[in-house]
């Protein structure tokens, strides 16, 4: 008894398809090569990229052939570039320059304004050109307000004009006497500490 999956090999009675008339005189490998050439020609006529099989890549014939030359001791476009220069070019090309400048104001605060100011004031936010600076005491906040124009000039010299247009100097938050969940509003905070 034989089942549908029993296969003892090709049937002897199966007809072998005959090649087309224009290929009737070819046999064996010549028939295969000619058929492959026709298939590649049909693919080219449809605009498809035709593979080259196992042969190597096609060499350029004539035309604009340039031999590589040594770059010499001077700087060249192929020389390794500094990481800072490459990232700066990337930021410019992607339109990130303003965001990078804003981040450098906060990230390099101590280098921008100096140690004496950085010890008593911390930048907290930069939104639309307004830099919010929190001072550790009301006296420090008052001193920062007096030198505000010099601070803006220092910041503009380091990161460029227009990044920071105004300084908002905030003193320390006063203590809260609020206890519990419920609260009755009083007369507001007093400047008793600071």
Swiss-Prot record:
According to the record, the residues making up region (Disordered) are 1-81
| Cited InterPro entries | DciA-like, UPF0232_actinobac
Instruction: Write out the biased-composition intervals (Basic and acidic residues).
Output: 30-52
Mark out the compositionally biased spans (Acidic residues).
1-14
The family classification in the record reads: Belongs to the UPF0232 family.
Query: What is this protein's name?
Result: UPF0232 protein in recF-gyrB intergenic region
**Which species is this UniProt entry from?**
Mycolicibacterium smegmatis (Mycobacterium smegmatis)
């Amino acid at each position: 008894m034989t089942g549908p999956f029993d296969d003892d090999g090709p049937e002897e009675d199966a007809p072998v398809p005959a090649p087309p008339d224009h290929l009737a005189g070819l046999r064996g490998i010549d028939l295969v090569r000619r058929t492959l050439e026709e298939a590649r020609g049909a693919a080219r006529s449809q605009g498809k990229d035709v593979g080259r099989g196992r042969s190597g890549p096609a060499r350029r014939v004539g035309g604009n052939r340039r031999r590589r030359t040594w770059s010499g001791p001077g700087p060249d476009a192929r020389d390794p570039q500094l990481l800072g220069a490459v990232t700066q070019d990337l930021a410019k090309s992607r339109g990130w320059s303003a965001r990078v400048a804003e981040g450098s104001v906060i990230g390099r605060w101590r280098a921008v304004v100096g140690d004496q100011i950085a010890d008593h004031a911390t930048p907290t936010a930069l939104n639309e050109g307004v830099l919010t600076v929190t001072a550790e005491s009301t006296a420090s906040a008052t001193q920062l307000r007096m030198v505000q124009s010099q601070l803006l000039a220092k910041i503009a010299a380091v990161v460029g004009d227009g990044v920071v247009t105004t300084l908002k100097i905030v003193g320390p938050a006063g203590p809260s006497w609020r206890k519990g969940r419920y609260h009755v509003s009083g007369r507001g905070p007093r400047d008793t500490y600071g």
